[in-house]
């Protein structure tokens, strides 16, 4: 089926484009959702000597945010693209720095990020997320109208042939040289991300744990599970009253993670694989084989078959609650049939009434997880691009990208070009870059930005 935008004439598309305010709409959304953003940046502990500072922290941080929103890949490209008077004028309004008369140099930004504690930017992100959580407009996305869905997943960021820093993770790969197999070391940096589901199409960074070795003398790499324990412990302190449903792939479907969730009163929906929890898998199959599973046919988008068994942990001799459920359906091709099957573990009591919503929640994790990281890696942000070789600056660049992504997701959900003509994310960012470089923000625009506005998201 064609999308709405495919039926529009070119003339109608041009008419929709005329309604686009470009960078002014981004500024309006920042004012609407994060009115004190520049203040939050300026309240960070400034690592610079006061007598040597020309730019405020908000000047520097917001320039980094705009670099990401406008899909500018490199620091050099930012230097060239942002050297325009409208950029200076717009950044002055965003940061509130009336003395700003020139864009900061990219080296100035990198030098600042080399010294700034990543906890400072993480704290700004926390304030942004709490501001969004308080808004009732996102409540409809809670699971059963109660639990905020938090998805955790790890991804690789940077890879090096030689040791980059003392915190590098290391792996050994086999490659062929002169007809012989040679084992060589490769060094890399990895991150564990917790994403908060606010609405369809809006899944924002909630917290980040960098997976790294404490020093170069450790005998074993830091791993995702250890990082997950640190991240979940911090989430419990930062959001002590937030009703959470944790979601993750089969890597996290282990008792230590489930125990942490139970200790904090959280729910969990974790992908199940027999290779990860063999005893549970065997007991589920044994109970189902004896007719102990509840089955519902014709559910889900594909009208497939759902099945569940509560408290499999009792027969498996496990401590943590393991209510298990699955969903399977067939797709037909040219004379062939393909079976698709998914299975999850949860501590939510399963019933015939809630099974379909639980299936949609479980399947949604994969889509959100892959779209989120795929867009950041291969879309407008290209988080694997090295903006600095300094390990501290690398972390801060990553966190600035997460802050920018929160703003950008809100804009994409609001943008008339996305909603009206289905413009791609990359083209939307390109138009924002041109708007930032060419559009003069007028007094009328400032009035539009600062007055109370009802914002309708897709």
Q: Which residue stretches match the model-derived regions?
A:
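A short, flexible helix-boundary coil/loop motif
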Residues: 85, 297-305, 377-391, 396, ...
């Amino acid at each position: 089926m064609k999308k709405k935008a495919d039926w529009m004439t070119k003339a109608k598309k041009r008419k929709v484009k005329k309604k686009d305010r470009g960078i002014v709409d981004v500024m309006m959304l920042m004012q609407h959702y994060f009115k004190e953003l520049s203040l939050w940046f300026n309240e960070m502990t400034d690592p610079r000597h006061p007598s040597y500072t020309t730019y405020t922290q908000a000047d520097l941080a917001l320039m980094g945010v705009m670099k990401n929103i406008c899909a500018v890949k490199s620091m050099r490209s930012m230097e060239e693209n942002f050297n325009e008077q409208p950029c200076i004028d717009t950044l002055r309004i965003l940061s509130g720095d009336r003395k700003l008369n020139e864009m900061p140099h990219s080296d100035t930004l990198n030098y600042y990020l080399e010294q700034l504690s990543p906890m400072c930017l993480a704290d700004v992100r926390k304030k942004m997320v709490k501001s969004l959580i308080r808004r009732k407009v996102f409540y409809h996305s809670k699971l059963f109208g109660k639990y905020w869905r938090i998805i955790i997943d790890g991804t690789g960021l940077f890879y090096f042939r030689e040791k980059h820093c003392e915190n590098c993770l290391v792996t050994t790969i086999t490659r062929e040289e002169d007809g012989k197999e040679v084992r060589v070391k490769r060094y890399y940096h990895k991150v564990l991300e917790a994403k908060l589901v606010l609405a369809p199409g809006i899944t924002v960074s909630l917290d980040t744990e960098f997976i790294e070795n404490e020093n170069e003398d450790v005998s074993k790499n830091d791993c995702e599970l250890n990082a997950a324990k640190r991240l979940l412990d911090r989430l419990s302190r930062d959001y002590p009253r937030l009703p959470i449903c944790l979601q993750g792939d089969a890597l996290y479907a282990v008792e230590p993670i489930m125990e942490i969730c139970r200790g904090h009163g959280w729910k969990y929906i974790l992908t199940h694989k027999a290779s990860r929890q063999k005893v549970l898998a065997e007991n589920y199959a044994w109970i189902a084989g004896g007719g102990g599973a509840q089955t519902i046919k014709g559910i889900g988008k594909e009208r497939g078959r759902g099945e569940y068994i509560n408290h499999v942990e009792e027969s498996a001799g496990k401590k943590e609650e393991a209510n298990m459920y699955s969903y399977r359906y067939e797709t037909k091709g040219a004379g062939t049939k393909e079976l698709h099957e998914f299975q999850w573990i949860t501590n939510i009591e399963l019933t015939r009434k809630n099974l379909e919503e639980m299936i949609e929640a479980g399947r949604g994790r994969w889509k959100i997880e892959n779209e989120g990281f795929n867009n950041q890696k291969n879309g407008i942000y290209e988080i694997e691009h090295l903006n600095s070789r300094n390990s501290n600056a690398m972390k801060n660049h990553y966190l600035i990208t997460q802050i920018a992504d929160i703003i950008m997701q809100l804009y994409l959900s609001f943008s008339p070009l996305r909603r009206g003509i289905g413009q791609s994310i990359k083209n939307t960012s390109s138009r924002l870059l041109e708007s930032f470089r060419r559009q003069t923000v007028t007094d009328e625009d400032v009035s539009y930005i600062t007055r109370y506005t009802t914002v309708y998201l897709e």
